[in-house]
Amino acid sequence: MNTDKHWLDEQATLSLKRLLPRIAARFEGQTDAVEWAAYRDRLTRHFPRLFACLHTLYGDRYDFFYHLESVLCAATELWLARPGELKGLDAMRETDPQWYLSNRMVGAMCYVDLFAGDFEGLRQRISYLAELGITYLHLMPVFKVPAGDNDGGYAVSSYREMNPELGSADQLAELATELRHHGISLVLDFVFNHTSDEHDWARQALSGDPEYQAYYRMYPDRTLPDAFERSMTEVFTEDHPGAFTYVSRLKKWVWTTFHTYQWDLNYENPALFNRMVEEMLGLANMGVEILRLDAVAFLWKRLNTDCQNLPEAHLVIQAFNAVASIAAPAMVLKSEAIVHPDEVSRYISQAECPLSYNPQLMALLWDALATREVRALQRAMQRSFTIPEGCAWVNYVRCHDDIGWAFSDEDISGAGFDAREHRTFLTRFYTGRFAGSFARGAPFQENPATGDARVSGNCASLAGVEQALEQQDESALELAIARVLLIHGVIMTIGGIPLLYLGDEIATLNDYSYDQDPAKLGDSRWLHRAAFDWQRCERRRDMSTVEGRVFQGLLRLIQLRRQNLAFTRAETEILDAGNPHVFAYVRSHDQHTVFVLSNFSEREQRVEARRLRQMGMRKTMVDLYAGRSVTATQELVMVPYQLMVLARVA
């Protein structure tokens, strides 16, 4: 396959010259001249990169140009169907393409049913989100899924039908509009590595239709599955050993990376890619402004590899990006890649995913709390926090999933730890098996033979709030609340978009009742998937309560971020504070600069004045978070778990 850029550009120009008249003849008359001219301009600008991706993936097929024309027709048809308000948003976003880098971006995520019951209930809670300062709302999977096992909504049976318990597709579109009118961008998942085995495509495949069987990866015997598995790593070793499931009705082995009821899609088939383009643009037309791409690492498969992070996976995502840029430029793609940190960063670019979760920062914040040291955190962030211009990390403390220790062995060993032993220590610490631990958590997918495990639990419980309340220890409670605010303070002030897991702002504790539900038994992740307690939330303004102390502290952090232009964009310079317990960085934008210092110890810490000067600080600074002047003649003294956001005195 010819991958020479000059040759591909020439072929793209020639191909568009041939295809554009055919597209125009079919669609131009369905809209006005001004709209069509704008669309044609976007198509002309972004077609070369779409062509390069698709030709590299599928150019050796005899029917390549048929599929190329088909994807352009699908994109154009769905652009024509796009609501006028969203086309207006497209135009606005093209004049401000990096809108998501604003310091006013503050994210939140939730399960609709657990937070508000359904879409209508969520509409009634928009005022709460506005009170908190949220401008980005990620709703966990809302699509139609099988009854019973459905991987928490990630086994999608239809991308166009909603879970009926939440509401209809029309209600979701209405919700998206109302959120947008309140300045909140809707974020949804695009579960595009697999469907459920109850999806219509899977049903058609089960009925024997070869066209739909080609949408998935199916094998008549174990020859190829055995060959693939020799170089692969199992994802869920307990629940689903291997990566294939025998389907007796088909008499075939189906590729099922995650669970037996989740069938992996076959992106080697361009017809499948085109169908998924239609599903993606359908979500865009519902009002989705940020699309989370689920399990990006697993999209492509090749023998004698681990079938993760392959170059073709990046090309598939880049092709989706190009299509969105043509037909729905208001929508931005976000990657979910829980893989080695070096691999995570490879998904991040304006041509692929401008946004990406930062699982390494999350894991290392918890590491720093457990060890009381920032050596690993500082080393890893100095090495890998910088990403391409125009892109941003989505930084979070907790989410719907477990905590995996997603940092590199190199960074941990460089900080003086044995990587394997250190992961074991962290798991023991956060599951309460380590003497002196403040945490209340539970292991997830624990392997007794190797000791490998991930950790479940709510932020407040993991940070010590639950234990302190149990022991009625006010001093321990004060430290625990300080931990919660400290790590949220980092995600609010470091480069990128901060993302709250709703419930953490009122210090929601672990829900141990999940194991009484047979459908949840054995999955400790339900420990941190409790229904939002609106009765506790009523105490959020009462500073004598835990809920009030955490909520008001977080609100101050959010307001600090939104009021200071230094937190615009994503650039962050990680500094060395000269103290192994203090994490330091500087944020700058135009004439605005702030220095952020975080004490990850329950002891008082000092930073030498000489080191402060080396980092660019002056003798007298203003702590924007505390709202007071700070003078450091000889040294700066930080109280336990203190966050300082220092600006020069004007």
Residue ranges and their predicted role:
Residues 2-650:
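Active-site and adjacent substrate-binding regions of carbohydrate-active enzymes
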